A protein has these predicted regions:
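Active-site-proximal N-terminal segment of extracellular/periplasmic enzymes that hydrolyze or transfer
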Residues: 109-117
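C-terminal cap/loop subdomain of S1 sulfatases and analogous C-terminal strand-loop tails that border
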Residues: 7-13, 17, 22-101, 132-136
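Generic leucine side-chain signal with a strong bias for well-ordered alpha-helical environments
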Residues: 98-101, 111, 122
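Residues within well-ordered alpha-helical secondary structure of globular protein domains
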Residues: 30, 51, 114, 124-128
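Cytochrome P450 catalytic domain signature, combining two hallmark sequence patches
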Residues: 56-57, 117-120
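Conserved N-terminal phosphate-binding loop of PLP-dependent enzymes in the Aspartate aminotransferase
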Residues: 1-2, 141
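Intrinsically disordered, low-complexity polar regions and short flexible loop motifs
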Residues: 104
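Charge-dense polyanion-binding interfaces
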Residues: 121-140
Length: 141
């Protein structure tokens, strides 16, 4: 993400913080001196923009894209990040893959067979996310 500076924003800074578009709103709100009055998923990264310490966000990030056309028939492509780990299903017709982005930022070596513990851990979190997203309020769980 590239941010153009203004008053108080440190020029030329770089960071490894993983932020998402949902983090822009709370950042702008904090910069305006206001408060978000309800629960939201995004988190402010204003301290980072001001050149202050910004702890990493302790959260999972989930990504979904629904594919159309005859080949995919509306199936989804899924991914999640937990720290340096990424679990991804790049096509509805492929297996889930696991990557350690600190060692393999290009995602060239699938570790799902070598690190079964991490694969199961992230897989369980992904299942919960998918089930929550598809939940219908009146259905029993």
């Amino acid at each position: 993400m590239k941010v153009e500076g203004g008053s108080g924003v440190k020029a030329g800074g770089r960071s490894g913080l993983i932020a998402a578009t949902m983090d822009i709103f709370p950042t702008v709100v904090e910069a305006a001196g206001a408060k978000v009055e309800h629960a939201i998923d995004g988190r402010s990264f204003l301290p980072l923009l001001l050149g202050k310490d910004q702890p990493a966000f302790d959260r999972d990030l989930f990504f979904t894209r629904r594919e159309g056309g005859d080949r995919f028939m509306g199936e989804c492509i899924w991914a999640m990040r937990r720290g340096d780990w990424k679990l991804v299903k790049n096509s509805p017709m492929t297996n889930w893959e696991l990557f350690d982005l600190s060692e393999d930022p290009g995602e060239t070596t699938d570790l799902s067979g070598k690190n079964r513990r991490k694969y199961r851990e992230l897989g369980a979190a992904m299942r919960v996310h998918i089930q929550r997203g598809g939940a219908i309020p009146w259905q029993k769980r």
